[in-house]
Regions:
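N-terminal ordered "arm"
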Residues: 7-60
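C-terminal accessory domains and tails appended to enzymatic cores
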Residues: 6-10, 129-269
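Short alpha-helices
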Residues: 83, 88-158
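Long, contiguous hydrophobic alpha-helical segments, chiefly transmembrane helices and signal peptides
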Residues: 25, 32-33, 37, 67, ...
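Positively charged, low-complexity intrinsically disordered leader regions
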Residues: 1-2
Length: 269
């Protein structure tokens, strides 16, 4: 169970069912496994997904959405794990269920970031149990390379502190018993495929992940159609303030102390 002080700082909406809301995912396993948990706990269905190229929807009439593993700009609801502040005084999305947003982690104090998956944060927030097997726990740590911080002497203390705050001390024991090479061997290609309006995950990789995680991975039913085209690119910290004020900004993430990955609306249908 998540540390009470940290839990109380998460937005209230993220702990309860939000009637009439649907999910927006991305094209990777961290997002889809997180959506699977939210579907199991709250019954949410996925209506949209976003890539760096565009935004796709099944039902265009649905207006209320929650991003999953998406660092949405403004005040839009999202579960996320990215650093989204370029400077210590940058605006932050108050509706982001994200440790890094809650603790005001920016590029100014980037080495203090929580470098875990969105999935781990959601599991802790909603008190979802860890996989039953050692192999399942190891695989969980490979998602979004959540294990990596432990193997840096510089980040290890921070990594361990965050794991304790999430209430997953058992995972600290797991990394102590596992080499970095072991994790690399367990890790799979986490990319999903979008083809002919459907979001899919390679059958063998899907079954492998499901067997280790202990639950079925949710995949949305229905035909996705392009709703918007994006312009995605990278820039540096010096342009962070200007970028955060851009009215066309869809999402962004600080990928290092100086680099920013961002996505802007280009064309909306």
């Amino acid at each position: 169970m998540m540390d009470t002080t940290l839990y109380n700082q998460f937005p209230e909406w993220s702990k309860v069912y939000n009637e009439g809301h649907f999910l927006v995912g991305t094209d990777d396993l961290d997002s889809q496994a997180s959506i699977s948990i939210l579907n199991q706990v709250f019954g949410y269905e996925q209506n949209c997904y976003a890539t760096r190229q565009g935004f796709f929807m099944i039902d265009w009439n649905i207006k209320q959405h929650i991003g999953v593993d998406l660092a949405l700009h403004g005040d839009r609801k999202c579960y996320d794990n990215h650093v989204t502040m370029s400077h210590w005084d940058s605006p932050v999305n108050s509706n982001s269920a994200n440790i890094n947003a809650i603790l005001k982690i920016s590029q100014d104090n980037y080495t203090k970031k929580c470098a875990f998956s969105t999935l781990l944060q959601i599991m802790s927030l909603l008190d979802v149990p860890l996989p039953k097997t050692k192999e399942g726990k190891q695989f969980l740590l490979t998602i979004d390379s959540a294990y990596l911080g432990y193997y840096s002497s510089y980040f290890r203390r921070t990594w361990t502190d965050y794991m304790e705050q999430l209430g997953f001390t058992e995972l600290i024991d797991i990394v102590r018993e596992t080499t970095s090479d072991d994790f690399k061997r367990m890790k799979i290609n986490e990319e999903l495929t979008f083809q002919d309006g459907a979001l899919t995950f390679d059958k063998d990789r899907k079954e492998y992940a499901e067997n280790l995680l202990g639950y079925e991975l949710y995949l949305p039913q229905g035909q996705f159609k392009e709703r918007a085209q994006f312009h995605s690119d990278y820039t540096s910290k010096q342009y962070g303030r200007e970028l955060l004020e851009n009215e066309c900004l869809f999402s962004l993430a600080m990928t290092s102390k100086n680099n920013i990955s961002y996505t802007l609306y280009n064309t909306v249908h």
